[in-house]
Curated annotation (Swiss-Prot):
It holds the Pfam family GP63. This is Gene 63 protein. InterPro entries: Gp63. The lineage of its organism: Viruses, Duplodnaviria, Heunggongvirae, Uroviricota, Caudoviricetes.
Amino acid sequence: MGAQGVTVRDLGSRVCSVRRAHGNRPGLNDKRSCAPTLFIHPLTATERNTQMTTPNAMPRKANPLHQQVLGALIKTRPTVWTHKAIDPESPDPKKPRVIETKVHGREVTGLARNVSEENVDRLAKRWIK
């Protein structure tokens, strides 16, 4: 009989008859080992990772230069600046009092000041997926 005409039951009975013919080996003659079973081999972690996929589905590795540029565009540093305002209730209008307040904040460094946040977001979406 060809391979196309073999069913699961046929395979099970043939395996059992072969096992019975080999004599008194332990575990070969019991009824449980002669039952036809379908064994689906689960994939190991290595097999799952090495399966071939189409090139479009494979993740693209980020360019290190792009990562460096984006890091420089995003990097901020702490800053403190003095905000000066004229006191409206000063006694002498010719020489008003100046109120100075220190403002603590963060600012973008270097040439990144000239790039808008929207453009930085566009670059990040395009370069790092």
